[in-house]
Amino acid sequence: MDRAARCSGASSLPLLLALALGLVILHCVVADGNSTRSPETNGLLCGDPEENCAATTTQSKRKGHFSRCPKQYKHYCIKGRCRFVVAEQTPSCVCDEGYIGARCERVDLFYLRGDRGQILVICLIAVMVVFIILVIGVCTCCHPLRKRRKRKKKEEEMETLGKDITPINEDIEETNIA
């Protein structure tokens, strides 16, 4: 019974490790939306806490819900361009390709997700190359072994043939004189 308990515990260990790895990967993959509010302050992200960000904005030409960002938000977006949400008086980011997050600060690990066809072709080619290298390696190792076996087999045949044939001495003449 003790052995059965150990086996069931050992088989659940890989399952638990896989579950933990899945949770870690899921945490890294989940992307935040492009929010412009800080969760700690729940307010606007200004340089000074006392500064009124909405009061310092300059009204530029308005195109729908968004306008150009004020100069104080020039470097707000890390890998993208800034736009200002007029209704909320907050900055927002439009991230470059391959970046995600509120300020485009994270690299999107699944950026090349749409190129599955190319990834599949590359994987198939890699598997075929590995298979060819494996076959060449096996053939290279087996060929000398086969030669050695053939040589040993020939030597053994020569020995057995030599033992089966009784040597005839030509110097001695056979006579039927009894």
UniProtKB/Swiss-Prot annotation:
Tissue specificity is:
Synthesized in several tissues and tumor cells. Predominantly expressed in pancreas and small intestine.
Question: What SUPFAM superfamilies does the record point to?
Answer: EGF/Laminin
Give TM regions: 119-139
**Per UniProt, which keywords does this protein have?**
Cell membrane, Disulfide bond, EGF-like domain, Glycoprotein, Growth factor, Membrane, Mitogen, Secreted, Signal, Transmembrane, Transmembrane helix
User: Which GO molecular-function terms appear in the entry?
Assistant: epidermal growth factor receptor binding; growth factor activity; receptor ligand activity; transmembrane receptor protein tyrosine kinase activator activity
What spans does the record annotate as topological domain Cytoplasmic, numbered to this chain?
A: 140-178
Give the CC-aspect GO terms: clathrin-coated endocytic vesicle membrane; extracellular region; extracellular space; plasma membrane
Disulfide bridge map: C69-C82, C77-C93, C95-C104
Quote the subunit structure annotation: Monomer. Interacts with EGFR and ERBB4.
Q: Which PANTHER family match?
A: PROBETACELLULIN (PTHR10740:SF3), TRANSFORMING GROWTH FACTOR ALPHA (PTHR10740)
Protein name listed in UniProt: Probetacellulin
Q: Which organism is it from?
A: Homo sapiens (Human)
State which gene encodes it: BTC
